[in-house]
Amino acid sequence: MTDVTAYAPRKIAHSEFVDMRGLKCHVRRWGPRDAQPLVLLHGSRDCGATFQFIVDQFAGDYHVIAPDWRGYGRTDWNPQGYWFQDYLADLDIVLDALVPGVAVPIAGHSMGGQAAGIYAGVRPQRVSKLIALDAFGLVDSDPSETPDYLSKWIRIWREGPEQSRPYETLAQMAERLVQTNRRLTMDKALFLAAESSRQRPDGLLEWAFDPLHRAPFAVTHRKAEWAACMMRIEAPTLWLVSGRVSRIESEPGGLAARAALVKNVVCHKVEETSHNLHHDRPAEVARIMEAFLNAG
């Protein structure tokens, strides 16, 4: 247990919902509506509140828009399951609803960064600048594992996914987050636990994402297809690299070879950070992002 007080946001997010292809999508918005827009896309098993710490560190005013992806946070779950390509279509709808007709800067972490990068390649007219936080494509799946992979996918659909573990208190959930990332401070963990959880009918707490997200996508990753999208990106791009060692570095050329696919990219490593670099060093991440957004 802990007697630490939860992190108190300096800038307050306002919640609203937009229709997203038949689902009710929850969106957090910070800052004046007439300020420069900035769209932030969260990663797997997370929600838009994950960006609160960097939003609080921005020196300038931005109209920050952070949707919860389908099946995450306060956005509706999809009983038919999830395909990665859904995120691209969902993002297109959210942009048309909230910032129609203009190219906007988009930043994404992990899965959200993967979606942002691919979207920037297939809809370049909608992205003015692109920021990827530890999101530089995946390592190719082993084709020989495809039969077992698809067998698992079928089994989960027939038997149901592993259900979320129940917790009695937010403090227990916060402690779980700290166990996963030892750099995360308890005050931030308590904030994230409160924003990323929901209460069950029996009064216990659970993480607010659809357990179906634990199922694998039905289509395995293909690096060549990802690379083709990267080569279509027109927007100036910033890759923010965490301090962890990535599997990508085991490839020939490592991260540099992947970065070379993008026409106009700058890579910046944020030392002494985990995959969640926006939690570990939010002031530095915000400073680097803001300098990039304001350049040119």
Describe the residue ranges of each PLM region.
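A catalytic-pocket lid/entrance helix-loop region that shapes and gates access to the active site
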Residues: L133-P166
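Conserved loop-alpha-helix segment in the C-terminal half of the alpha/beta-hydrolase fold
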Residues: R232-T273
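Alpha/beta-hydrolase fold catalytic core
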Residues: M1-L38, A59-Y62, V99-V102, G137, ...
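Conserved alpha/beta-hydrolase catalytic His-Asp/Glu region
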Residues: P161-T220, C229
